[in-house]
């Protein structure tokens, strides 16, 4: 059983404040919820289990039981998960406030220990102190957290997470902030709490405390498309698709890391809860993570033989050709922007190949094909530049004054002509490697300009940011018919 979950369940009964703050979905009646997909720690109840996606940020960080409350660590309502979430620069004073909150919600003193032990000793067999019966008294105060970086903002979700070595398929990684506080001071706080426990439980408490307070922080993970709801991923091919999210909000305003101080003033906390409400947002899918997902899918269906062909139609419109026809039934081609990029990239590359190589049919086997498969995924800049460089070398460029040039005298379509004029100010007859890089990036940036994209979607914005964008109608950016350049 998860220690944090058990502790919330038992401590919820001791007073009115705890009854409001420590209410977890995992301790209530189970309700239908979205299917689980990954394994990790539920941020709400801290147990290691199968996770489903959060309705507030679409990432997988909540269990099926806790999903009924729809709590997200990015909410503005001061529920327990939000009060345990700190952001960016965490000071020693912030950590003191967190420890005070823990001590307020989960006190250990003689009265509390006697109360729980008396309620547990219902039968003769329960006279001895067995760990599983007193799990709720064995949660030490630590500075253990799960952290995540979202476009420059680092969030720390503090809690007590059991079994740290278990499989973790989420973008969160364990971080220990004890060095930012004071080890001896935290030791003293826990030793004082431990002193009220029976001797047989003190050893288990100490073991748990030191194992969760002396660990080495993990390397922070990179957020990828795999960490977001499969429902979102399956609809990325639709340019007009918007992500629907809900956030738990309140009228309370405070610095982000100061919310945990609310529990010190019970009346103020309940006044804030009276203003609690849910806000709905429609969010654009525009970000690097989702853009790269689409470009990677398209890359899997590339037919490189088109660059040596003589087809009169664009690359996505070739039919009945064994070497050049793509399968238009894949959903990735439903996004006209991906088709435009594919057509223009291959129209430009075919002009380069036809200008520099003596290849007359798409059935021929050429070395250049193996590098063309990576020309769409511009998000992986290093790999993309290597692919373009190898393509350039396959053209057997002529070197003049230590600069290599390739001919460019084959016809291209009007879209490519316009992009040539925009990127190099003319329709050139010869091109350097740098010119080719600029032109190919311009073709992709016309629709997906990753230079000005967030890495993660706006579903990972805080409520304050979402409200500011919503007032300017910017949460749904770029209509389906408008490119990034326009």
Swiss-Prot record:
Organism: Rotavirus A (strain RVA/Human/United States/D/1974/G1P1A[8])
Protein name: Non-structural protein 1
Spans annotated as Interaction with host IRF3: 317-486
Keyword list, A-Z: Host cytoplasm, Host cytoskeleton, Host-virus interaction, Inhibition of host innate immune response by virus, Inhibition of host IRF3 by virus, Inhibition of host IRF7 by virus, Inhibition of host NF-kappa-B by virus, Inhibition of host RLR pathway by virus, Interferon antiviral system evasion, Metal-binding, Phosphoprotein, RNA-binding, Viral immunoevasion
Any GO BP: symbiont-mediated suppression of host cytoplasmic pattern recognition receptor signaling pathway via inhibition of IRF3 activity
Organism phylogeny: Viruses, Riboviria, Orthornavirae, Duplornaviricota, Resentoviricetes
GO MF terms held by the record: metal ion binding; RNA binding
Motif IKBKB-like degron (ILD) motif per record, residues: 479-483
InterPro entries: Rotavirus_NSP1 (IPR002148)
Family: Belongs to the rotavirus NSP1 family.
Segments of this protein annotated with the region Important for cytoskeleton localization: 82-176
Region of interest called Zinc-binding domain, as start-end residue ranges on this chain: 42-79
